[in-house]
Amino acid sequence: MTLAVMLQGTASDVGKSVLVAGLCRIFHQDGLRTAPFKSQNMALNSGITPDGKEMGRAQIFQAEAAGIAPDVRMNPILLKPTSDRQAQVVLMGQVATSMDAVSYHQYKPRLREQILAVYQSLAGEYEALVLEGAGSPAEINLRDRDIVNMGMAEMAQCPVILVADIDRGGVFAAIYGTLALLQPQERARVKGVIINKFRGDVALLRSGIEQIEALTGVPVLGVMPWLDVDLEDEDGVALQAGKYHRTDRRDIDIAVVHLPHIANFTDFNALAAQPDVRVRYVRDPQALADADLVILPGSKNTLGDLCWLRESGMAHAVEQARQRKVPLLGICGGYQMLGETIIDEVESGLGAQPGLGVLKTVTHFAQHKTTTQVQATLGSALPDWLADAAGLRVSGYEIHMGETRREAGCPPLLQLHKAGQAVDDGAISDDGLAFGTYLHGLFDSDAFTRALLNGLRQRKGLAPLDSALEYARYKTRQFDRLAEAMREHIAIDKIYAIMRQHQEPLC
């Protein structure tokens, strides 16, 4: 029978996703066929499986840690917020509908059978499953319809390990309060606690650990230190918390506009990993003053974020950067915003709205959502400073609802290779300093990223760097470093014992 364990947290952003990835890596290293699973994920960072299904980025990088290809069954429900009260509901990788929070809460019980069937199908193929909860299991107002925390643990009949974040303070209160709010049968599933993100001497915690174990009867399985491991973040919490607000100087300064509905900011992880690059996420228009490249990222609410650009003064700051000859790149929603016109007769019903007018393009929103992995080739119309990128092969994925057409004389940035045909994508401005594309994951292609950065270095009078960072190997090293640290600081043997002791047939 399949071994299974579920990590739940005392709150959001306590580090569940990273620790799940670490366990997946450890079990993979130990020779077990392992897969991650999260029944419901709310995030704007998503990716595409090899068969064109959309799922959360967290489960994609967890699958990578487990040494397997991502499978939409690992994240059957994805909620993508489009506003403070509305979210797009993606079921098994395809858009199903949009709902407000109250309607979705009423709808959730209908999903239980599908979730269980998907989980059972994974359990039939893998030797170990590592489940992840969402937020906290102690949200007592949501308990009756829970499908992602204790409700999922009950369906899977698996033990739970509670993760608590000491960096935010009040860790023992968070552990005690969470366990106190659980029902007796729920609390009985919690077989251990991991204290995460500790800075300092663990000896200072010993008396507290002894007391919390005595108070709750639940053992603390380990104390994970704060790790400088570069792994993907699930949502915008990391941006708000300042993880990417670097202050050290690098040769190349890249400013990513932090849109209110920013999506797929994982696009820029490979950029941030480069030795000569500082990536900043900015909302202050003045923060564009020193940028060597400005990026408008993806958005889950293109027109809403376009309005914010104008109201915040960021659109004016982008135009000032253009006047200073600073290169500008738009990806997906950012690409749409850079065009002349956006026509929306689907979502908002606003009709034709003016874009920023940087690229000679017109975007029509559509009901159909394009979700596909693609290979592409950089076009030949690149400016001199980017000439080394011409003809390079890149890979990535598309996630967008809409079609963008170039006006006559506006060259494409890329040629996508789809079903044996070459399809133009993206656009280049007349001055060769502004670009747009629908392709996410572009910077994961090492040769292109180094060509772009060396072009920016050339514009600053800096010598090029010869070697390109091999981002795939870089990520593998991060997974291995995480696994090594978890083996050192967490009683992995006890986790194995918990999983084996509570191995039960699925209901």
Swiss-Prot record:
Metabolic or biological pathway: Cofactor biosynthesis; adenosylcobalamin biosynthesis
Domain GATase cobBQ-type: 251-448
Gene3D superfamilies (alphabetical): 3.40.50.880, P-loop containing nucleotide triphosphate hydrolases
Alphabetized InterPro entries for the sequence: Class_I_gatase-like, CobQ/CobB/MinD/ParA_Nub-bd_dom, CobQ_GATase1, CobQ_N, CobQ_synth, GATase_3, P-loop_NTPase
MF annotations from Gene Ontology: ABC-type vitamin B12 transporter activity; catalytic activity
Presence of keyword Lipid metabolism: no
Highest taxon in the source lineage: Bacteria
CDD domains noted in UniProt: CobQ_N (cd05389), GATase1_CobQ (cd01750)
Biological processes per GO annotation: cobalamin biosynthetic process
Classification via Pfam families: CbiA (PF01656), GATase_3 (PF07685)
UniProt keyword Disulfide bond present: no
Keywords: Cobalamin biosynthesis, Glutamine amidotransferase
Active site (record annotation): 332 (nucleophile), 440
Function per UniProt: Catalyzes amidations at positions B, D, E, and G on adenosylcobyrinic A,C-diamide. NH(2) groups are provided by glutamine, and one molecule of ATP is hydrogenolyzed for each amidation.
Family statement drawn from the similarity comment of this UniProt entry: Belongs to the CobB/CobQ family. CobQ subfamily.
Name of the featured protein: Cobyric acid synthase
